[in-house]
């Protein structure tokens, strides 16, 4: 196989982030400097983001049998890079008072971002597995980064063991699919799985095992048990990455698999996915009702959001509107989650032991940090799907797609789940405006809005509001990615 200059241009984001990993690694070996290594990481991620323009000029192409670069890959690569950039930005003030080694944090985030980019471009079950492992392995270290805290260490061990088990299910499922189809490429699977072949027991077992592995990575019920504990135990910036980049990259590659291989044509698989979606929506929202820890609440909330997205995935065979719905919903979910976890990161910075994740820590926040409280309110309203926010546009799309595909009981689950979600999101928002306790526990720095993390949070809030009122630019970008699939 010959690598041409066009191929190299198409792989620019992957190459730039890979080069940044090497540069940061050498920088750490030469001299430890927190500011220098954080700056190098942010420059590398920004350069990768800018390089997407050049990738767009090169056009869609299969760079290798494992990777396809097109509009779809560019959209999801951009979302992963934005989430990674926000994670590094939130991590810098959090790590300022951290007594152990700080620099490896950025190295692990960059390697995980590399895995996310690989997933966005994956066109083969081998690259899907490599990407998932490349994004998961650094997260084992990141989740347990505050290892002197028992909760963080426990979360890391739990995530490592369960993730390894999920990967084994995924790999075994791929082996069964290969045994039946004779190929691992998404396109070849689409060609080979015709004429009722999807009803073969071996193939159904293979895809069933893959659903178990991918369901764990996406925190879908009943493979979700790790989610609230890991979100709570992980440092706030790591929870940001887990909730955004990791989920978006994996859901993106699942979308591509369903587009090329007619997995959704099997009635048995559709029923299983519908049950998982229904359970994720209802259970995720019900469990969030009783939470008094914001990170656990957002963890259960992410389970329900992935359930909503699964509704659009099940309806994928009905038309292009499903792809549009997933793209718009994921962008809304990205900015809403970045804003919510960003506020938690700002409240928890610099590192002083456990994060400010108790709901009591946010009581009366409006009276001494009004702008920060307003930002958190906007994020809660967007996650709840209130009109005039980007979250509403995404949820409306999902409902429209469900109605179009006649998935009536899933549409009912989305409506009921949204109603339940409204209660606990508003509970967080209302607590921000109650009378502040006489001795508040934790507080954000007085100049938080001038920090890089503060700027990211403010921009996220602005985008959630502006795109909620005028979503056409976002819809146009998502549509641009679709014909190139």
Swiss-Prot record:
Enzyme class: translocase
InterPro entries attached to this UniProt entry: NADH-Q_OxRdtase_suN/2, ND/Mrp_TM
Compartments in which it is found: Cell inner membrane
Pfam families attached to this UniProt entry: Proton_antipo_M
Chief localization: membrane
Protein's membrane topology: Multi-pass membrane protein
EC number: 7.1.1.-
GO biological process entries: ATP synthesis coupled electron transport
One Gene Ontology cellular component annotation held by this UniProt entry: plasma membrane
GO terms, molecular function: NADH dehydrogenase (ubiquinone) activity; NADH:ubiquinone reductase (non-electrogenic) activity; quinone binding
Transmembrane segments annotated in the record for this chain: 8-28, 35-55, 71-91, 105-125, 127-147, 159-179, 203-223, 235-255, 271-291, 297-317, 326-346, 373-393, 408-430, 455-475
Keywords associated with the record: Cell inner membrane, Cell membrane, Membrane, NAD, Quinone, Translocase, Transmembrane, Transmembrane helix, Transport, Ubiquinone
Catalytic activity: a quinone + NADH + 5 H(+)(in) = a quinol + NAD(+) + 4 H(+)(out)
Family: Belongs to the complex I subunit 2 family.
Function, in words: NDH-1 shuttles electrons from NADH, via FMN and iron-sulfur (Fe-S) centers, to quinones in the respiratory chain. The immediate electron acceptor for the enzyme in this species is believed to be ubiquinone. Couples the redox reaction to proton translocation (for every two electrons transferred, four hydrogen ions are translocated across the cytoplasmic membrane), and thus conserves the redox energy in a proton gradient.
NCBIfam families reported in the protein's UniProt record: NDH_I_N, PRK05777.1-1
PANTHER family (UniProt xref): NADH DEHYDROGENASE
Subunit structure: NDH-1 is composed of 13 different subunits. Subunits NuoA, H, J, K, L, M, N constitute the membrane sector of the complex.
HAMAP family, per database record: NDH1_NuoN_1
The protein's name: NADH-quinone oxidoreductase subunit N
